[in-house]
Amino acid sequence: MSNRPFTAKFPRYPENGDEVFIRGKLKDDAKSFSVNFCLPRPAQVAEHQTPPYIALHFKTIYDERDDTSRVVLNWKNLQWQQEEVLDNYWHVDRSQTFRVVFRLHEDCIKVFVNSVDHPPDYQFPVQLPLDQIESIELWDDVEHVEEISFRYDNGNC
């Protein structure tokens, strides 16, 4: 069973252009790491279970056999949908602190490594309502979370 070491609720529902910044450290022997952008969890779904509605599932999987890794992008509407598997070039050295920014748009979520002053490293279409995302969950082999910041686009205020 996966381990969910951290959950953070959005201070308000996100809007187009808002960002989530995460800085943390994986275990040196991490096998996987996931970030889920979750819609409200129905009362009958236990906290240790994966939520039924996930706008973005961003997972990095490390293969110990050949020292390769990959990124899996997916979403969930009761059932997991078709996943997209890409090369991992955002966080290869698990001994180093990671910094990742998720920029939320009505039609996609863009993923940036370290900062947003370059084209997105990954991008995934949003199939569930952006303004219903209420939390993010970090799963699997996280050693510690140093920071999660919610950055709101002032044009939306």
Predicted regions and their residues:
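Eukaryotic short linear interaction motifs
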Residues: D29-K31, P42-V45, D107-V111, H118-D121, ...
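Short, aromatic/His-centered strand-loop micro-motif at the edge of beta-sheets
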Residues: L78-R99
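Short, solvent-exposed beta-strand-to-loop segments that form ligand-recognition rims
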Residues: V116-I133
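Secretory/extracellular carbohydrate-interaction modules
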Residues: M1-W75
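Short amphipathic alpha-helical molecular recognition features
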Residues: P14, Y89-V92, V101-R103, K110, ...
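Hydrophobic beta-strand residues in large extracellular and virion-surface proteins
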Residues: I22, V35, F58, F102, ...
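Ligand-recognition surfaces built from glycine- and aromatic
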Residues: M1-S2, K9-G17, G24-A30, L128-C157
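Carbohydrate-binding surfaces in secreted/extracellular proteins
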Residues: I22, R94, F98-D121
